[in-house]
Amino acid sequence: GTVMIPRIAKLFHDKKTEQMRQYIQQSYQFVWIIGIPIMMGVMAIADTFVPVFYGSGYDKIKILLPIYSLSVIPVALSNVTGCQFLIPTKKQNVYSAAVLSSTVVNVTLNSFLIPRFLSYGAASASVIAECVGCIIMIVYVEVKHLVDIKRVFSISLKKWVAGIVMFLCVKVSNEICNTSVLGLTFLILEGTII
């Protein structure tokens, strides 16, 4: 974001729309390359990571961590769409509306889900709220033909396949490995290699 915002603002000012779109596409590509493995990796190693990092008595986090990891992609997509594109192109009102909508959804869902599901409800509400904000921004840039969102998602397909393969391999190894720093290190290395 820090690198892209001034560059996109300059290209927008100079009316270099095509070059601006290319940079944004590269940012989306980066989101997929980094975000999918992080999300899938956290989901896959949670059962080993929690006891090693937190110790015993924190089993609830084994469920919360994978739930929260689902927000990695919407947060990253919102960053590219909102911070790196909408704000530098003087569409702050759309960005603000998406953030406000996300906040309203989060508060509303929290009021229903926390009393019933406690921390699981809070985690789920946060993920849903992030998705709502992301969807609002993405729909806006697609409807206004500012970014080719179909292309954004089509470039992600191979990364999703690789991420799912990595998840499955690490999850199977997670069942075999012992819960130790060495076991966790092995799982992380395995995921990195895949």
Residue map of PLM features:
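Short runs within selected transmembrane alpha-helices of multi-pass transporters and secretion channels
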Residues: 1, 63-90, 94-114, 119-143, ...
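Hydrophobic alpha-helix feature that most strongly marks membrane-spanning transmembrane helices
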Residues: 1, 13, 32, 54, ...
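Juxtamembrane/interfacial segments around transmembrane helices
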Residues: 4, 38-44, 81, 114-121, ...
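Membrane-water interface at transmembrane helix exits
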Residues: 9, 46, 50, 87, ...
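Membrane-helix boundary/juxtamembrane motif in polytopic membrane proteins
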Residues: 23-26, 94, 147-157
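Transmembrane alpha-helical segments of multi-pass transport proteins
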Residues: 102, 153-194
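Specific pore-lining/lateral-gate transmembrane helices of multi-pass inner-membrane transport
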Residues: 1-100
